[in-house]
Amino acid sequence: MIFNPNLQINIQYRHILEDEGNLERMKSITCKNLTSLLRGEIEMMKMKVSANYKLAVPQYYQHKIQLLLPLCLEDGKTPDMALVVSKSDSGKYYQGHTCLTLEIAYNNARLIAKPESNWLVP
């Protein structure tokens, strides 16, 4: 599966920003408006992935192929989280599910193959 940057990503911001597990994973990020930060970073990530499709790393979870997309929330340069997305059944958009630490994302991606992307390292 190759990421299509022209498709919209529907994000479950409430789940991502109110879920205890996600908040724990993002505890080092200091920002008063995480929703705005996340929205801006998702737009930046889409531009980066459109320039280099290998940044979108596949993972297999709950009988589906999903993509892990790098998010650089702390400094805007170094990935510190992975956004999990899957293509909708209609194929018209991606559904953003959650954010994972890089360690969890790497372990999930390894179930398919060793990730070729240089942002997702153990």
Predicted features, each with a name:
Residues 64-122:
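Compact beta-sheet-dominated globular domain cores
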